[in-house]
Curated annotation (Swiss-Prot):
Signal sequence region: 1-15
Family: Belongs to the alpha-casein family.
Species of the source: Ovis aries
Biological role stated in the UniProt entry: Important role in the capacity of milk to transport calcium phosphate.
Entry keyword set: Milk protein, Phosphoprotein, Repeat, Secreted, Signal
Main location: secreted
GO cellular component, one term: extracellular space
Keyword Phosphoprotein found: yes
A Gene Ontology molecular function term of the record: zymogen binding
Expressing tissues: Mammary gland specific. Secreted in milk.
Protein name: Alpha-S2-casein
Entry annotated with the keyword ATP-binding: no
Amino acid sequence: MKFFIFTCLLAVALAKHKMEHVSSSEEPINISQEIYKQEKNMAIHPRKEKLCTTSCEEVVRNADEEEYSIRSSSEESAEVAPEEVKITVDDKHYQKALNEINQFYQKFPQYLQYLYQGPIVLNPWDQVKRNAGPFTPTVNREQLSTSEENSKKTIDMESTEVFTKKTKLTEEEKNRLNFLKKISQYYQKFAWPQYLKTVDQHQKAMKPWTQPKTNAIPYVRYL
């Protein structure tokens, strides 16, 4: 009985020893296999690790540059902001003056138009009215009367001289007397009152302020 128990214990001990030896031998095999796989992966894909490292470095660099640019821009904006505030406060009056000047120059053509229209409304006689009738020259009555008197005086003086000096007339003087007679006949035929009336009517038509109301009286010709 004792021998049987001893053999069982011995068998169990041997079995444990074998199991430990197998497990211990399997562990280095597994470790060696893992190391081999890692070395194999490193040998097959060396570029991937390089790419990963370079891309990571670039990402880090870009992030650093962005942070630096953001900091610099924030610092510059902080420096520029008070200067801009000072400029706007100092130039308010200048900008107002410029705006007023621009508005004045924009409205300047309208002012010129109003100034041009004002005198025309106040002085309607400056606007010349064109009549459809024939134009008659404006002659003053005094000038006509003086010219008529002078012509009559000259004719009378020459006629008296002709009667007193009938014996001393020459051909040139005779021709002159004939010319003067023709002139006197022309002046006698010319209707002076009719001409003066036409001149007066034309002057009234050109100056409406002297006669605001026009009378529709028919024209009667003087004979």
